[in-house]
Amino acid sequence: MLDAFSRAVVSADASTSTVSDIAALRAFVASGNRRLDAVNAIASNASCMVSDAVAGMICENQGLIQAGGNCYPNRRMAACLRDAEIVLRYVTYALLAGDASVLDDRCLNGLKETYAALGVPTTSTVRAVQIMKAQAAAHIQDTPSEARAGAKLRKMGTPVVEDRCASLVAEASSYFDRVISALS
């Protein structure tokens, strides 16, 4: 797993040069409080997000909770909730690090094959991830630290207020899209 700083150093080391991507590192540092706010917003609402996503998935496919369905009996429902929570947790890790490698290496590697072997319907799982993606975007947009603290407390390049979370929403969405691609 490489964060933005490690990636820049490894890249510079491989080319035997100095770290030249200072602008990208400066942007990463400047987004630090917003990034922490975004991760906190997702982590603080994780239980509700997971249960709502699984409930939404079940509402769209009632067969999942019927006898023989993948969310029946209770132990299968618990496994479904656990898996959704794990996916969400690794998305937050990736968002915090600014890098998808932790998500790829520790969560997505072999996930589709495992679900296929267990007979888990990936279309329903993809739908639950899509619901969590929409929820995460809503929670991230609702937690602007700059709006509460004021520009005088943020000296590292505060963005325009309307656009303060757009890049983090896009980044988080890209991580959810990676999960969806891995399952499809």
From Swiss-Prot:
Description of how the protein assembles with itself and partners: Heterodimer of an alpha and a beta chain.
Please give the SUPFAM superfamilies that the UniProt record associates with this protein: Globin-like (SSF46458)
The record's listing under InterPro entries reads: Globin-like_sf, Phycobilisome_asu/bsu, Phycobilisome_asu/bsu_sf
Has the keyword Electron transport been applied to this entry? yes
Induction field: Transcribed during growth in green light.
Q: Which GO terms describe its cellular component?
A: phycobilisome; plasma membrane-derived thylakoid membrane
Keyword check for Transmembrane, yes or no: no
Localized where? Cellular thylakoid membrane
- The residues the record assigns to binding (2R,3E)-phycoerythrobilin 3 are 165
Q: Name one GO biological process term.
A: photosynthesis
| Membrane-protein topology | Peripheral membrane protein
Keywords annotated in UniProt: Antenna complex, Bile pigment, Chromophore, Electron transport, Membrane, Methylation, Photosynthesis, Phycobilisome, Thylakoid, Transport
Q: Name one Pfam family in it.
A: Phycobilisome
Q: Which gene underlies this protein? A: cpeB
Family, according to the entry, reads as follows: Belongs to the phycobiliprotein family.
| Protein name listed in UniProt | C-phycoerythrin beta chain
| Record-listed (2R,3E)-phycoerythrobilin 1 binding positions | 48, 59
State its role.
Light-harvesting photosynthetic bile pigment-protein from the phycobiliprotein complex.
Q: How is it modified after translation?
A: Contains three covalently linked bilin chromophores.
Instruction: Tell me the leader sequence span.
Output: none
Q: Which residues carry this modification: N4-methylasparagine?
A: 70
**Positions that bind (2R,3E)-phycoerythrobilin 2:** 80
